[in-house]
Amino acid sequence: MAKSDAKVSQGKRNSAPNAINNVKTRRYSLWNFWICATVLKVLLFPGYYSTDFDVHRNWLAITNKLPLNKWYVESTSQWTLDYPPFFAYFEWFLSQFVPKSVAEDGCLDIVKVGSFGLPTIIFQRITVILSELVLYAALQVFINTSDISEKSANFVVASSIVLSPGLLIVDHIHFQYNGFLFGILISSIVAAKNKRYILCAAFFSIALCFKHIFLYLAPAYFVFLLRAYVLDFSSFKFRSYKDLISIVQWSNLLKLASVVMGIFSLAFLPFITTWQQLLARLFPFSRGLTHAYWAPNVWAVYSFTDKVLTVLVLKLPYLQKILSIVLTSMPKTAADIHVRIESNNSGTRGLVQDVFFVVLPQITPKLTFLLTLFYQILAVVPVLFDPSFKRFVGSLTLCGFVSFLFGWHVHEKAIMLVIFPFSFLVPFDRRLLTPFTLLASAGYVSLFPLLYESQDFLLKFLYTFIWCILYFYAMGQTSKVNRSGVRRIFFFDRLAICYYLLLIPMVLFVQALDVLKHKYAALDKYEFLGLMIYSIYCSIGVLSSWIGLSWLFNFDEPMWN
């Protein structure tokens, strides 16, 4: 018996090093994911594509056929170039590889409306797939540079992003280049994690010069780099205001400023003669508050509330008297309300001009800017006191959140600006899983109206449903449990479960409504009902996620230490 026990004991001692060695030698590669995903994407080549396809085709033509000083002036097509210079250079680069057969197909023609066939479609689809390798490379570096204990969880995060339903729907069906652009942004996040601050600033500056929507994340980067790389409080003792100069590491500040200014100079200096036109293209405030399809944010709820109040006021005259006391800008009579409804674009006609509300006060770009700025300040203040990677990503996520929730003319596709940074947070604490799953499920489902044809319904529904089941479970298994060692169930979690359960019947109901509209003419007057249901229900999920993350970020200090 003694010899037997000794052998068992010896076996246990030998198994521990073997387990460690297995973890060390296991390769977490995204290569197989790229191969499998590419097969699916190639099968989607002949399918639906949006007007964004002709947008990018036109940009290929502009950058290929015209001199650089005409790029932001050309307006033959309504799809004018309205991305920053690096993306224009990117389009020019792609245009150099257009085969003769594709050029003859109309790919490089500057015309009012593009006329092209399968060769152009195949070429442009391939450019999206190949450019997405930047995203795979960035996430592979993220995995490879992780500690052994983090690799499994970080592999789940990385694979969840490369297989994102958002990228499949928006890039490989609808048509855009978000995978490539987020690859550059994620490279900056990975550099921040590895404390490569100059590289972090460089990648973010490059991302910003590719797509200006990343400007919403700039406050988090600015405060993080300032606090982590430029300011040093380790030996600071305040005796006079002159001592404040000593906390600045001037050499680091100079290096940081040189890199950022160098990248922006490279991007914008060639367009110095047309800078006014360039800025007008990048920031078109002539567009309305909401897009044709309301993005699931605060203004969707605001628009819906205005429509409900309009109906109630017309049916209940006494309610109009009560509301007019509080809302001084409200029309005084029912006739005035009808006039405003007829004369104004009230937010459901699929237009991009100014949106006017009937009952509620009008929203201005200035108000949306101030609301966004206020909540972003709240998001970055904690980073001043704790410039850790975890705090930085939390701040980054909240900056993306508030820009999506309160921004002017926000597109539903911008939800990925929140989901992807949030993905990097989940492994740190399982309590973050509930707000993340709310955001991801609501956010990805809110993209469904982009693919409005019935033939695409099963693909978008099943792919998103399977993704949610697999990755919500995997993240729950790999994320860290809080210090108490027990997963605490909050009332918030129970409400989230109810939300998930109702999400599926909501999607099925809207799809049934869409199918029946083609059979029954009486349903034509409810043309925008399905979009409104999507927008409002998904808004509830996104807003709930923001509230949950904000609470944990600001009031659960142990989570971030």
Swiss-Prot record:
Keyword Ubl conjugation included in the entry's annotation: no
Pfam families xref list: Alg6_Alg8
UniProt GO cellular component terms: endoplasmic reticulum membrane
Membrane-side (Cytoplasmic) residue stretches: 49-125, 176-205, 274-366, 412-431, 478-494, 549-561
Lumenal side: 1-27, 147-154, 227-252, 388-391, 453-456, 516-527
MF (Gene Ontology): dolichyl pyrophosphate Glc1Man9GlcNAc2 alpha-1,3-glucosyltransferase activity
Subcellular location, record wording: Endoplasmic reticulum membrane
Annotated pathway: Protein modification; protein glycosylation
Lineage: superkingdom: Eukaryota
Catalytic activity, as annotated: an alpha-D-Glc-(1->3)-alpha-D-Man-(1->2)-alpha-D-Man-(1->2)-alpha-D-Man-(1->3)-[alpha-D-Man-(1->2)-alpha-D-Man-(1->3)-[alpha-D-Man-(1->2)-alpha-D-Man-(1->6)]-alpha-D-Man-(1->6)]-beta-D-Man-(1->4)-beta-D-GlcNAc-(1->4)-alpha-D-GlcNAc-diphospho-di-trans,poly-cis-dolichol + a di-trans,poly-cis-dolichyl beta-D-glucosyl phosphate = an alpha-D-Glc-(1->3)-alpha-D-Glc-(1->3)-alpha-D-Man-(1->2)-alpha-D-Man-(1->2)-alpha-D-Man-(1->3)-[alpha-D-Man-(1->2)-alpha-D-Man-(1->3)-[alpha-D-Man-(1->2)-alpha-D-Man-(1->6)]-alpha-D-Man-(1->6)]-beta-D-Man-(1->4)-beta-D-GlcNAc-(1->4)-alpha-D-GlcNAc-diphospho-di-trans,poly-cis-dolichol + a di-trans,poly-cis-dolichyl phosphate + H(+)
EC number(s) from the headed UniProt entry: 2.4.1.265
Record-annotated membrane-spanning stretches: 28-48, 126-146, 155-175, 206-226, 253-273, 367-387, 392-411, 432-452, 457-477, 495-515, 528-548
InterPro entries tied to this protein: Glyco_trans_ALG6/ALG8
Membrane protein topology class: Multi-pass membrane protein
Enzyme class: transferase
Keywords, in A-Z order: Endoplasmic reticulum, Glycosyltransferase, Membrane, Transferase, Transmembrane, Transmembrane helix
A GO BP annotation: protein N-linked glycosylation
Function: Dolichyl pyrophosphate Glc1Man9GlcNAc2 alpha-1,3-glucosyltransferase that operates in the biosynthetic pathway of dolichol-linked oligosaccharides, the glycan precursors employed in protein asparagine (N)-glycosylation. The assembly of dolichol-linked oligosaccharides begins on the cytosolic side of the endoplasmic reticulum membrane and finishes in its lumen. The sequential addition of sugars to dolichol pyrophosphate produces dolichol-linked oligosaccharides containing fourteen sugars, including two GlcNAcs, nine mannoses and three glucoses.
Family, similarity comment: Belongs to the ALG6/ALG8 glucosyltransferase family.
Protein name per its UniProtKB record: Dolichyl pyrophosphate Glc1Man9GlcNAc2 alpha-1,3-glucosyltransferase
Species of provenance: Kluyveromyces lactis (strain ATCC 8585 / CBS 2359 / DSM 70799 / NBRC 1267 / NRRL Y-1140 / WM37) (Yeast)
Lineage: Eukaryota, Fungi, Dikarya, Ascomycota, Saccharomycotina
